[in-house]
Amino acid sequence: MGERLSVAVQGFHPSSFLSEETARLRELTQGMKVISAVSGGVDSTVATLVAREALGDNLFPIMIDTGLLRVDEPEQVKERLSRSPLSLKLRLVHASGRFLSSVKGETDAEEKRKKFRETFYQVLREEAEKEACEYILQGTIAPDWIETQGGIKTQHNVLEQVGIDPATTYGFKIIEPLADLYKDQVRALGRHLNLPKEFSERQPFPGPGLLVRCIGNVTKEKIRVLKEATKIVETSLSPFNYEQYFAAIIENKFAKDPSTKTISETASEALGLPNSEVHAEVFEDRVTGVKGDQRCYGLVAGVKLSEESRETYGWLQDRLRQLQTGIVEKFPDITRVALLVKERRGGGPLSIIVRAVSTRDFMTAAVSPVPWKILKDIGQQIMKEENVSRVYYDITPKPPGTIEFE
């Protein structure tokens, strides 16, 4: 990755970093062509702008349409980046069929990430060969490789840090201008580069896209429903300035476990409610969590309160914190707790889980106190989708949950 002199523990100076990094990139590439993998997020966009300062017309930005992005996102990103002051020419590569085929039938979160990574770099290799490029530039930042090295989860854009030689495996070398930076530093650098606020302050979106929010088996229908739910959640929560907010999707398959009754009793005790007003179910599909700084695959407990209790306890932070902590500590196989917001009896086979967190560095995160009225409105909108019968709100901080579900 090279030495970066301006990144210090106590401070970050965008102008110094930019000067050092552009000089490093010029020396490294020696006038050769470089492909930049752009997702539309702040990390890859800032990395591309840094590289353009150094490489000019030798930089070729592309965006891969994986089929796992938001509704109309590839076209919107291309159009927005082409505007002044960025004036970035972005080429779209359509490969949605390849990505969906690569994860078909796979339910394990880590295996899905690895298969996405393999397809992602295969597509990049093909594009690099077309342009006769030896280098691929990407927006890897420090939390990406820290989580991968720590065994918490595989980030698709982390290679060399985990012993994968991209030159040998894929036929090109990797450039990562931001690999020592954290999200707040990347945003500061973006502002220094006159990146419009819609990019510099944009909430993070994972490289594998909706893949890591589609819990369990991935199907075109689940992705379609998730795209619509994502649009509703992001539109509803954008005024609140939470660092990250999104929807995940899970099938309504529940574990037939005798401990479910005990989980319900634990939830009742934590909330100070009669057992008759609290009911818990445990989903079969597992999600990624963190315990003792290590990755674990845990279950999701869905907690349903009576209608009256839901209105009363819809957002009492202390009680919900006790609810989550009480269940996770007593049942080690559970890493997440979600509170039921809305349901339709006899509805479809899918549930949507809404997540919103507040964080500075994305290494830890607190649950954001979304007003109960807003959650109910989100639930009402999402329930118009006939395949969805339940909407939950995730009340799990990081740790023991990760921000993303897979």
Task: For the regions a language model picked out, list residue spans one by one.
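ATP/NTP-dependent adenylation/nucleotidyl-transfer catalytic domains that generate, transfer
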Residues: G2-E406
